[in-house]
């Protein structure tokens, strides 16, 4: 069939008449639906993943689902005033948080806005919520310790600067207490701290803030709060916000400690957001990228070399390394560490401190299970004197737990086995520690030396705690020079050993407890 010229011109005219001349808005869109903090938007063709988008009334959201004909976004704040048909605009900026020295001592929400009633924060700048972790070439090995002040951790599960050490256990086993004690111990160390509270009761966070202020650690700490009452979207971004604030100090050649309390609740929030965005669920209804959720966060904790710091500060800081040490917390259900999220985070981190309900209920606090707790890189960073004195302690406790289990089936024990059990009972008592009472290196070394040298063997088990308190008080008053030397140098040698032996013998001979 042939078309003549007249028919062809008619066809072309029809095509031209039916052509839609309206231009597609690439940086603007309109709300199609809004529910449960999730918005479906038509338009926004140029939006990036993770970009901050602006609604009316100065409300912001974050684009998370980029589909062929729509965008799925979460609203970071109140969404009750957002209606179908409202205009949404791109900002060409990823979600950012304020950073800087001005943030220290303040309580903020995940967007960096003050919620402590002390007025606005005049921040030094802003950083994107998510950035790439430092590469292999930018990193330095972990070889400097971070003292938590907790005997059981510093002696047996040491943490180094730049390490990721997981704190894991059931609810009400003292996970937050361990992390808060570690923060309190940094008040005079120059190490900055960030505490991220995710999905917690406001009353619990208020208690933490009050305790940090009481013990003089708040001025050195940023507290990021996404409480149980805020939207899942804010709980999801809270750890990344805290990490961005901490990285500001790391990239200037400083040392930072960050606590994520806890990442289980962040995973729950992310699962909720993902299901509302209609992403396909996987194991335990978590989305497929829940491993990446935590790995990309925890990989940002690192020790960086001087070249990286110089590059990040444009040459202003030279010859200085920086570090970001992470203490993520994971809550288990019924002691099940083989669940989905716990196994993920265990595989990402450089070791774990496992807290046990049975030990906690037995009065052994912190309730650290020495057999299941490990630090994969902290040994290289441990203070010399604690490393040399602490090795024997771990062995004593391990043998004690084994022998106690064996002794249940046998009433007739030889003298050597009974002596080992007696030693283990005393070491177990010695490892107990009250909350909010971190110890210095010298105080810890004194107690570890007394256990290692058999100086506790003639003291009744129920008197060990009284002996410990009195011995520390005696050393602070009568052995000031020795204690200062141990704190400053941190090395262990025959001279230190002899001086400690003489001092403790003198205390046992001339003092009571």
Curated annotation (Swiss-Prot):
GO terms for cellular component: plasma membrane; proton-transporting ATP synthase complex. It comes from the Bacteria. It is a peripheral membrane protein. It catalyses: ATP + H2O + 4 H(+)(in) = ADP + phosphate + 5 H(+)(out). It is found in: Cell inner membrane. Keywords: ATP synthesis, ATP-binding, Cell inner membrane, Cell membrane, CF(1), Hydrogen ion transport, Ion transport, Membrane, Nucleotide-binding, Translocase, Transport. It is an enzyme of class 7 (translocase). InterPro entries: ATP_synth_asu-like_sf (IPR023366), ATP_synth_asu_C (IPR000793), ATP_synth_asu_C_sf (IPR038376), ATP_synth_F1_a_nt-bd_dom (IPR033732), ATP_synth_F1_asu (IPR005294), ATPase_a/bsu_AS (IPR020003), ATPase_F1/V1/A1_a/bsu_N (IPR004100), ATPase_F1/V1/A1_a/bsu_N_sf (IPR036121). GO terms for molecular function: ADP binding; ATP binding; proton-transporting ATP synthase activity, rotational mechanism. Its EC number is 7.1.2.2. CDD domains: ATP-synt_F1_alpha_C, ATP-synt_F1_alpha_N, F1-ATPase_alpha_CD. The keyword Membrane applies. The record marks 373 as: Required for activity. ATP binds at residues 169-176. F-type ATPases have 2 components, CF(1) - the catalytic core - and CF(0) - the membrane proton channel. CF(1) has five subunits: alpha(3), beta(3), gamma(1), delta(1), epsilon(1). CF(0) has three main subunits: a(1), b(2) and c(9-12). The alpha and beta chains form an alternating ring which encloses part of the gamma chain. CF(1) is attached to CF(0) by a central stalk formed by the gamma and epsilon chains, while a peripheral stalk is formed by the delta and b chains. Belongs to the ATPase alpha/beta chains family. Produces ATP from ADP in the presence of a proton gradient across the membrane. The alpha chain is a regulatory subunit. This is ATP synthase subunit alpha. It comes from Vesicomyosocius okutanii subsp. Calyptogena okutanii (strain HA).
């Amino acid at each position: 069939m042939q078309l003549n010229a007249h028919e062809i011109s008619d066809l072309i005219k029809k095509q031209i008449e039916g052509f839609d001349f309206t231009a597609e808005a690439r940086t603007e869109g309109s709300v199609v639906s809004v529910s449960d903090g999730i918005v479906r938007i038509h338009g926004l063709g140029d939006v990036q993943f993770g970009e901050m988008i602006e609604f009316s009334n100065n409300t912001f959201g974050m684009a998370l689902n980029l589909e062929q004909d729509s965008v799925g976004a979460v609203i970071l704040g109140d969404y009750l005033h957002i209606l179908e048909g409202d205009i949404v605009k791109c900002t060409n900026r990823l979600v950012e948080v304020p950073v800087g020295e001005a943030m220290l001592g303040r309580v903020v929400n995940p967007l960096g806005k003050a919620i402590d009633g002390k007025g606005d924060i005049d921040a030094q700048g802003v950083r994107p919520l998510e950035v790439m972790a430092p590469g292999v070439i930018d990193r330095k090995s972990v070889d400097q310790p971070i003292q938590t002040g907790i005997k059981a951790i510093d002696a047996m599960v040491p943490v180094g600067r730049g390490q990721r050490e997981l704190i894991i256990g059931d609810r009400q086993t003292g996970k937050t207490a361990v992390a808060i004690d570690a923060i309190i111990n940094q008040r005079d160390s120059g190490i900055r701290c960030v505490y991220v509270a995710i999905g917690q009761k406001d009353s619990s966070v208020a208690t933490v803030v009050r305790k940090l202020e009481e013990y003089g650690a708040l001025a050195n700490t940023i507290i990021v709060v996404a409480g149980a009452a805020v939207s899942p979207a804010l709980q999801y971004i809270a750890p990344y916000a805290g990490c961005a604030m901490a990285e500001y100090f790391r990239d200037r050649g400083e040392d930072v400690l960050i606590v994520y309390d806890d990442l289980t609740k962040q995973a729950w929030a992310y699962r909720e957001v993902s299901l509302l965005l209609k992403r396909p669920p996987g194991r335990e209804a978590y989305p497929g990228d829940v491993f990446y959720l935590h790995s990309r966060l925890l990989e940002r904790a690192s020790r960086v070399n001087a070249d990286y710091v110089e590059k990040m500060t444009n040459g202003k800081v030279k010859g200085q390394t920086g570090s970001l040490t992470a203490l993520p917390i994971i809550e288990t259900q019924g002691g099940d560490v083989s669940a989905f999220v716990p196994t993920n985070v265990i595989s990402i981190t450089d070791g774990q401190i496992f807290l046990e309900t049975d030990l906690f209920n037995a009065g052994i606090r912190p309730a650290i299970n020495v057999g299941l707790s490990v630090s994969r890189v902290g040994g290289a960073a441990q203070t010399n004197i604690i490393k040399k004195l602490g090795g024997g302690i771990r062995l004593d406790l391990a043998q004690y737990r084994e022998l106690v289990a064996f002794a249940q089936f046998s009433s007739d024990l030889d003298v050597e086995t009974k002596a080992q059990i007696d030693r283990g009972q005393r070491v177990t008592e010695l490892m107990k520690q009250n909350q909010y009472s971190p110890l210095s290196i010298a105080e810890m070394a004194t107690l570890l030396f007394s256990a290692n040298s058999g100086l506790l063997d003639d003291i009744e088990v129920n008197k060990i705690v009284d002996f410990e308190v009195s011995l520390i008080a005696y050393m602070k008053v009568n052995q000031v020079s020795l204690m200062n030397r141990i704190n400053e140098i941190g090395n262990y040698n025959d001279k230190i050993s002899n001086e400690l032996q003489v001092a403790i013998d003198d205390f046992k001979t001339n003092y009571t407890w």
